[in-house]
From Swiss-Prot:
Coiled coil: none annotated. This is Small ribosomal subunit protein uS4. GO terms for biological process: ribosomal small subunit biogenesis; translation. SUPFAM superfamilies: Alpha-L RNA-binding motif. The gene is RPS9B. Keywords: Cytoplasm, Ribonucleoprotein, Ribosomal protein, RNA-binding, rRNA-binding. Component of the small ribosomal subunit. Mature ribosomes consist of a small (40S) and a large (60S) subunit. The 40S subunit contains about 32 different proteins and 1 molecule of RNA (18S). The 60S subunit contains 45 different proteins and 3 molecules of RNA (25S, 5.8S and 5S). The lineage of its organism: Eukaryota, Fungi, Dikarya, Ascomycota, Saccharomycotina. It is found in: Cytoplasm. It comes from the Eukaryota. Component of the ribosome, a large ribonucleoprotein complex responsible for the synthesis of proteins in the cell. The small ribosomal subunit (SSU) binds messenger RNAs (mRNAs) and translates the encoded message by selecting cognate aminoacyl-transfer RNA (tRNA) molecules. The large subunit (LSU) contains the ribosomal catalytic site termed the peptidyl transferase center (PTC), which catalyzes the formation of peptide bonds, thereby polymerizing the amino acids delivered by tRNAs into a polypeptide chain. One of its GO terms (cellular component) is cytosolic small ribosomal subunit.
Length: 189
């Protein structure tokens, strides 16, 4: 089977100044609050946000009735509403400029699994996802940074073949059940 072509464009951009204590503290707080693996995950969200804000700024410079502003602006807003970053009552380009990285971090699968109570902590949520215990709809998703759409949010649950979702029990549990069955048979004799 042929492999998919690689994209060589960067998905994140690092800060120009590496040691700013205020920024470092803010990043550490975000990484802890949302259970991120490294700073690159924060930089990736910031990069996405900067591209979205750049597009919004470009569209805001155009005339109100400009067809490009109307078409592309509505498409941008609709996309942000669909993933749940922008609320229905704030469907204007001005509100797009007010978006923060936290809005995008809230929509990650890892955060949603924790908020739904499927995991004991944000870190446990990441482990459950990478170990393929979580499904969105019928599709198992093992990427913690997966952006959950609003309509998919209600379909997040344990995978049907996961021990948590009523599937086959794990190795240790099966072993312990086997021991329990053998002890019961010996007592009967």
């Amino acid at each position: 089977m042929p492999r998919a072509p690689r994209t060589y464009s960067k998905t994140y951009s690092v800060p120009k100044r590496p040691y700013e204590s205020a920024r470092l503290d803010a990043e550490l707080k975000l990484a802890g609050e949302y259970g991120l693996k490294n700073k690159r995950e924060i930089y990736r969200i910031g990069f996405q946000l900067s591209k979205i804000r750049r597009a919004a700024r470009d569209l805001l410079t155009r005339d109100e009735k400009d067809p490009k502003r109307l078409f592309e602006g509505n498409a941008l807003i609709r996309r942000l509403v669909r993933i749940g970053v922008l609320s229905e009552d704030k469907m204007k380009l001005d509100y797009v400029l007010a978006l923060k990285p936290e809005d995008f971090l809230e929509r990650r699968l890892q955060t949603q699994v924790f908020k739904l109570g499927l995991a004991r902590s944000i870190h446990h949520a990441r482990v459950l996802i990478t170990q393929r215990h979580i499904a969105v709809g019928k599709q198992i998703v093992n990427i913690p940074s997966f952006t959950v759409r609003l309509d998919s949010q209600k379909h997040i649950d344990f995978a049907h073949n996961s021990p948590y979702g009523g599937g086959r029990a794990g190795r240790v549990k099966r072993k312990n059940q086997g021991k329990g069955g053998e002890e019961g048979a010996e007592e009967e004799e």
